[in-house]
């Protein structure tokens, strides 16, 4: 029989790996954004996005821009593809994080 604790840690590891993939894709998206749309890059604080002095309100703007698919009207196909990838990874990572939290609650009740 599979240990529930081992299953939880495996799920947690998959979630962390997907988070790393998401942040890597987001960084690549910002590089593409800097080249194809400098105004949007500054609007979402692309230069300070992953720094300690980054502005969370501007970072949230990029998240909502991608989540609501406002990039579909953009002129650059590479940017659209990157946004689609980041959006899919965001949804996957959010679902996995939710599953990890539910699993943790289940483990606390079970054990």
From Swiss-Prot:
The gene coding this protein: uspB
Family the UniProt entry places it in: Belongs to the universal stress protein B family.
NCBIfam families: PRK04960.1 (NF003435)
Keyword Cell membrane appears in the UniProt entry: yes
Membrane-related topology note: Multi-pass membrane protein
Cellular localization per UniProt: Cell inner membrane
One GO term describing the cellular component: plasma membrane
TM ranges: 1-21, 90-110
Keywords noted in UniProt: Cell inner membrane, Cell membrane, Membrane, Transmembrane, Transmembrane helix
Record carries keyword Cell inner membrane: yes
Record Pfam families: UspB
Protein name stated in the entry: Universal stress protein B
Signal peptide positions on this chain: none
